[in-house]
Amino acid sequence: MIVRTLDECRNSERRIVSDNWESTRMLLKDDNMGFSFHITTIYEATETHIHYQNHLESVYCMSGEGEIEVVGGETYPIKPGTLYILDKHDEHYLRAYKYKEMVMACVFNPPITGAEVHDENGVYPLVD
């Protein structure tokens, strides 16, 4: 059994900070569960281009407000209780509204190793 708290993970190398977001990676590839689980905060008044070409992701909004715009498609509002699933490696823009940072629970398959950040194309590399 694996037991971890958000606080202990935040105070470790499992917390990754970027310009637009920070992510606490609570469950990673080396935990051998077949997926990874993160609590991610999207900073207020930001826009992040993301295109997970190597991963599928489901995201549940726990707090805050924003929107997700699928490139070449629709824009969907995000608020607490919203779940979105990137089941087609959807290229998108994630926006948190002003004064409304978003806190999200994220699940990735395949799992990430922990240190990944988006490259210039919004992609996480596939790491063995």
Swiss-Prot record:
Q: Does the keyword Cell cycle apply?
A: no
In terms of CDD domains, this protein maps to:
cupin_EctC
Q: What is its EC number?
A: 4.2.1.108
Which Pfam families does the protein's record reference? Ectoine_synth
State the reactions this protein catalyses. Answer: (2S)-4-acetamido-2-aminobutanoate = L-ectoine + H2O
Instruction: Spell out the molecular function terms from Gene Ontology.
Output: ectoine synthase activity
Domain of life of the organism encoding this protein: Bacteria
Q: What pathway, per the record?
A: Amine and polyamine biosynthesis; ectoine biosynthesis; L-ectoine from L-aspartate 4-semialdehyde: step 3/3
Q: Which UniProt keywords apply?
A: Lyase
Q: Which GO terms describe its biological process?
A: ectoine biosynthetic process
KW Lyase (keyword) present: yes
The record, for HAMAP family, names: Ectoine_synth (MF_01255)
Q: What does this protein do?
A: Catalyzes the circularization of gamma-N-acetyl-alpha,gamma-diaminobutyric acid (ADABA) to ectoine (1,4,5,6-tetrahydro-2-methyl-4-pyrimidine carboxylic acid), which is an excellent osmoprotectant.
Give the family from UniProt: Belongs to the ectoine synthase family.
* Protein name per its UniProtKB record: L-ectoine synthase
Q: Which gene encodes it?
A: ectC
